[in-house]
A protein has these predicted regions:
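Short glycine-rich phosphate-binding loop at a beta-alpha junction
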Residues: 19-24, 192-194
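Active-site-proximal beta-alpha core segment in soluble small-molecule metabolic enzymes
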Residues: 22-159
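Active-site loop/helix belt of alpha/beta enzymes
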Residues: 118-227
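Short hydrophobic "helix-edge" motifs at membrane interfaces and signal-peptide entry regions
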Residues: 13-15, 206
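N-terminal, Lys/Arg-enriched amphipathic/low-complexity engagement segments
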Residues: 1-8, 15
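Glycine-rich phosphate-binding loop signature in dinucleotide/nucleotide-binding domains
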Residues: 15, 106-108, 187
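A generic secondary-structure signal marking the coil-to-beta-strand transition
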Residues: 19, 110, 209-211
Length: 227
């Protein structure tokens, strides 16, 4: 495990990329702290409950790479934001408006990345006009901080390394590049572009689009990811 962590950390440093590994397989704050001590800027979680465990274990910066929906969970998100830097993915105007309303009531600001659908077809915004509209909405809200964008090419993660895999990732990166260009032209300049996984980071890193990579599974499953 230590060798895998060192190998991953060295790779991302060589590419001038921040490392924010996904901990859905890692699970424990103790291992997350080992990774952070080796150079990661924080972790990525799939669920609010995972983020709560990580914060309780002392992790100070967390991206929740899914939408937090419903007033009760948003209230928990607000509470967690008092204890650590929490960023969450968003892709829906109604949810963002609810987040802003509850954040105002709780006297906190919530950090968000807008998720762009770059081929996974599970979540994220597909149409450029919808993406720009959500950027504009967030810009007008007092308690939502726009930090950037997230795009996940997960449909390519399990493919064997081949021209087909590279073509799939290339198509995703082209979608991401176009979306970023359109947003920047309208004055929405991201600090963070998050994405990439253990099955794709070796290719994604060469496109120069991301500021941080979420690869975490390779901490354990080095044989699957050819470290």
């Amino acid at each position: 495990m230590e060798d895998n962590i060192s190998s991953l950390s060295s790779f991302f440093k060589s590419k001038n990329l921040n490392w924010r590994p996904h901990v859905k397989g890692i699970k424990t704050p103790e291992i997350a702290q080992k990774i952070i001590n080796s150079g990661a800027i924080g972790v990525t979680c799939a669920k609010l409950s995972e983020a709560e465990v990580m914060v309780a274990g002392g992790v100070g910066s967390i991206l929740i790479a899914n939408q937090i929906v419903g007033s009760k969970k948003i209230e928990r998100l607000c509470a967690l934001s008092n204890d650590a830097e929490i960023i969450t993915a968003v892709d829906d105007a109604g949810v963002v408006q609810m987040m802003n309303q509850i954040a105002q009531q709780k006297s906190v600001n919530l950090n968000v990345l807008i998720e762009i659908n770059i081929g996974m077809n599970r979540a994220g915004i597909t149409q450029i006009k919808d993406l720009l509209n959500l950027c504009q909405l967030i810009d007008e809200l007092d308690h939502i901080n726009f930090l950037g964008f997230m795009g996940w090419e997960g449909h390519a993660a399990g493919m064997e390394d081949s021209p087909y895999k590279r073509e799939a990732i290339d198509a995703s990166m082209k979608l991401l590049k176009v979306a970023l260009s359109e947003c920047k032209q309208k004055g929405f300049h991201p600090k963070i572009i998050s994405g990439g996984g253990s099955g794709t980071y070796l290719i994604c890193a060469d496109y120069g689009l991301h500021t941080e990579i979420q690869a975490g599974g390779a901490v354990f499953t080095d044989s699957a990811y050819h470290l």
